[in-house]
Amino acid sequence: MNLKEKYADLIVRSGLNVQKDQIVVIRASVEMNEFVRLVAKACFEVGAKDVVVRYSDDAINRLRYQTGNRMPYYYEAQFFNETALKGACYLSLVGEDPDAMKGVDPKSLSSYSKALRGMTQPYRDKLDYLQSSWCVASVPTLAWAQKVYPDSKDPVSDLWDAVLKISRVNEKDAIENWNEHRASFEKRVNILNQLDIESVHYKNALGTDLVVELPEGYVFAGGGSFLENGLYYFPNIPTEEIFSAPKKTGVNGKLYSALPLAYNGAIVKDFWFEFKDGQVVDYDAKEGKEVLTSILDTDEGAKYLGEIALVPYGSPISALNTLFYETLIDENASCHFALGASYNECIEGGLKMSEEELLDHGMNQSFTHVDFMVGTSDLSIEATLKNGEKIFVFKHGKYTSEFDEYSLN
């Protein structure tokens, strides 16, 4: 196999963990068609029943949104609901032009996303309750590559080199690389889950000074996830994060972005949020504030945090010292949070709870989930335990030896 074939095989066998007689749904840009064929071939090689590809085109999507009338058709929702009920798994290949929707009203984009999400509850439930696997992976396109490497003579080739490197695809067995990567998360996840943390305090020189309470019965996870049927899969390739959910009403203080946010084809730069009792009460940005407004206006839950994620500064992705303008990659270069929905697996018993029960346990619910990066080289994160003890989880942007050597006995 060449490296691209190895990457496709990794996505199918480890990312999605495709099973015999399973339907695979792929969403991708038309520019990715050659790589999509490699993925489809790998799917059929492991016994997939069918591979259904849904292509999109940045230029056409832009034209449709500019009319202001772009809303989902019933058949779009029916497709996802029907395939979900038939046990399908879902692959999203990202790599669109980061500037594709520049100048398009953000409300048009968020209205479409919100409407489609509301029409696809059966599909969403299969993913949220870990009954169907899903994976997001990146594939270089020309516009994206030129954005990342504007001075390169061959930006697509350079971006492919970076994507394969951060995805741990090399001359070795890529699947074995990911099995080893999975094991690297386990010790820290175990410590976090047994520390009995009450809150964590984030501080850095940008101005971040934020206290985040964790809900009773919080669960940290990292690497991949177990489906309800026991199968293990990796939702993100690459991934470097250990994540959980904050208590919805337990976030107070100011939080500054460390990297630009690429969202729906628009860029937001140098932004911050102020939280009181969990809710965003003030915010601003040097560029793209209207995009933040469209996110926060999605629904009531969009004004609260749903994810807290730990990524050490100096991770393999951050070591490249490159802004990729793609959240999948950039979020794994930096500690981050997400506005909107929390993950059901991030609280004990969450996979058996209704939305109302999750809310009662402090888990935010929303139609949206938008990650943004906050990690810096001077970030500190101090945990306060329920017994009053304090321990620095992060100093200077990285896990501390105090945390890594913490005894749970």
Language-model-derived ranges and their functions:
Residues 1-252, 389, 401-409:
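Active-site bordering "gate/hinge" segments
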